[in-house]
């Protein structure tokens, strides 16, 4: 049995797996120090798969809290290969899990964002709910992802955009792989990636497919002092969707404000989700190339909208949310139509192989 004395020397409350798991099953919330301890044991390879699975399922059974996830985020960073990227940076990512198999909206949006002049540090992995993951598509577009952390940071300066491949920056997560794979269900580990960008990005647009978790994710960003837009489509997509309305949690100055957003308020007509459907990485990469070449249609609308969400997180404005997003969409459209976004990708490919 693993046990630890909490900070402050409280020897009457030694932490152990039975104590934590019983607490979860009794419906008691854990402290940030509790969850930080548990994940530290896990990431040092000192927990069994049964303990890991019990912890993950117990948290979901009870319902994760902002404080519990904040403790996990703290430990994730302690075990991560973090990098320093000077200046204001932004990330755009989805948690996955919506099962819609759409094209890679956040990946295309990241490139367009960089085309507007924003410095983008994207954190991602293999496929979760898209037909292919960010890394799969970027490889098909020619971006070299086999870079050292130091080189990843340098690429951000040279190209205005870079990609942190989660498995390379959070290697200690290998210890949860077996338990996660055998469980086959959503757990808190599905949400930690978007919360732990290795560059410690302070602005992000994050899509969350799970309704209960979206405001929790927003709360974690607020607790950490970030400027963020967290959203969930009322169709279940982990995007600012164009097939229905969305719920948006605007995080600013440590506070969270919830709003409803209708894409028709920015001139986008609703489309069926099939209009955003993707396929394998080669297909999705071709969609990205056509977008950057100026192709109009539902995919472009979705990319402009999500790019605007990230711009709003990076440079928060005043006034109605729809007005702020409309202004961001205009900037994103100019980045595409001027060729700036396409040139960003070309530069990214070149410097990633230098």
From Swiss-Prot:
Binding sites annotated in the UniProt record for anthranilate 1: 94, 125
Binding site for Mg(2+) 2: 238-239
InterPro entries found in the cross-reference section: Anthranilate_Pribosyl_Tfrase (IPR005940), Glycosyl_Trfase_fam3 (IPR000312), Glycosyl_Trfase_fam3_N_dom (IPR017459), Glycosyl_Trfase_fam3_N_dom_sf (IPR036320), Nuc_phospho_transferase (IPR035902)
UniProt superkingdom: Bacteria
Record-listed 5-phospho-alpha-D-ribose 1-diphosphate binding positions: 94, 97-98, 102, 104-107, 122-130, 134
Residues binding anthranilate 2: 180
Enzyme nomenclature, EC number: 2.4.2.18
One GO BP annotation of this record: L-tryptophan biosynthetic process
Keyword entries, A-Z: Amino-acid biosynthesis, Aromatic amino acid biosynthesis, Glycosyltransferase, Magnesium, Metal-binding, Transferase, Tryptophan biosynthesis
Binding of Mg(2+) 1, residues: 106, 239
GO MF annotation list: anthranilate phosphoribosyltransferase activity; magnesium ion binding
An example Gene Ontology CC term for this record: cytosol
Record field: catalytic activity: N-(5-phospho-beta-D-ribosyl)anthranilate + diphosphate = 5-phospho-alpha-D-ribose 1-diphosphate + anthranilate
Pathway: Amino-acid biosynthesis; L-tryptophan biosynthesis; L-tryptophan from chorismate: step 2/5
Signal peptide location: none
Cofactor: Mg(2+)
Annotated cofactor note: Binds 2 magnesium ions per monomer.
Oligomer status and interactors: Homodimer.
Protein family: Belongs to the anthranilate phosphoribosyltransferase family.
Function recorded in the entry: Catalyzes the transfer of the phosphoribosyl group of 5-phosphorylribose-1-pyrophosphate (PRPP) to anthranilate to yield N-(5'-phosphoribosyl)-anthranilate (PRA).
HAMAP family registered for this protein in UniProt: TrpD
Protein's name according to its UniProt entry: Anthranilate phosphoribosyltransferase 1
Organism, scientific name: Streptomyces coelicolor (strain ATCC BAA-471 / A3(2) / M145)
Lineage: Bacteria, Bacillati, Actinomycetota, Actinomycetes, Kitasatosporales
């Amino acid at each position: 049995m693993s046990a630890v004395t909490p900070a402050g020397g409280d020897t009457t409350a030694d932490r152990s797996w039975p104590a934590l798991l019983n607490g979860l099953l009794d419906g008691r919330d854990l402290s940030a120090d509790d969850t930080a301890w548990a994940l530290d044991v896990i990431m040092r390879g000192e927990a069994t798969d049964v303990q890991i699975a019990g912890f993950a399922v117990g948290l979901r059974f009870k319902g994760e809290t902002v404080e519990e996830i904040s403790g996990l985020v703290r430990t994730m960073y302690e075990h991560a290969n973090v990098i320093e990227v000077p200046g204001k940076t932004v990330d755009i990512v989805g948690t996955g899990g919506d099962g819609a198999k759409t094209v890679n909206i956040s990946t295309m949006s990241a490139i367009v964002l960089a085309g507007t002049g924003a410095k983008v540090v994207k954190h991602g992995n293999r496929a979760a709910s898209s037909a292919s993951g960010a890394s799969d598509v970027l490889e098909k577009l020619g971006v070299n992802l086999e870079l050292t952390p130091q080189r990843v940071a340098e690429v951000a300066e040279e190209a205005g955009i870079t990609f942190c491949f989660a498995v390379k920056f959070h290697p200690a997560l290998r210890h949860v792989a077996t338990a996660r794979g055998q469980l086959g269900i959503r757990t808190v580990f599905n949400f930690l990636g978007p919360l732990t960008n290795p560059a410690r990005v302070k602005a992000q647009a994050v899509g969350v497919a799970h309704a209960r978790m979206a405001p929790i994710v927003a709360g974690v960003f607020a607790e950490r002092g970030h400027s963020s837009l967290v959203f969930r489509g009322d169709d279940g997509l982990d995007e600012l969707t164009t097939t229905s309305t969305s719920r948006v949690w605007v995080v600013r100055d440590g506070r969270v404000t919830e709003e409803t957003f209708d894409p028709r308020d920015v001139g986008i007509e609703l489309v069926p989700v099939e209009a955003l459907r993707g396929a394998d990485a080669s297909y999705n990469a071709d969609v990205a190339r056509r977008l950057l070449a100026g192709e109009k249609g539902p995919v472009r609308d979705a990319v402009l909208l999500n790019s605007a969400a990230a711009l709003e997180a990076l440079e928060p404005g005043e006034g109605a949310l729809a007005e702020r997003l409309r202004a961001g969409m205009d900037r994103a459209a100019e980045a595409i139509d001027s060729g700036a976004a396409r040139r960003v990708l070309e530069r990214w490919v070149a410097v990633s192989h230098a």
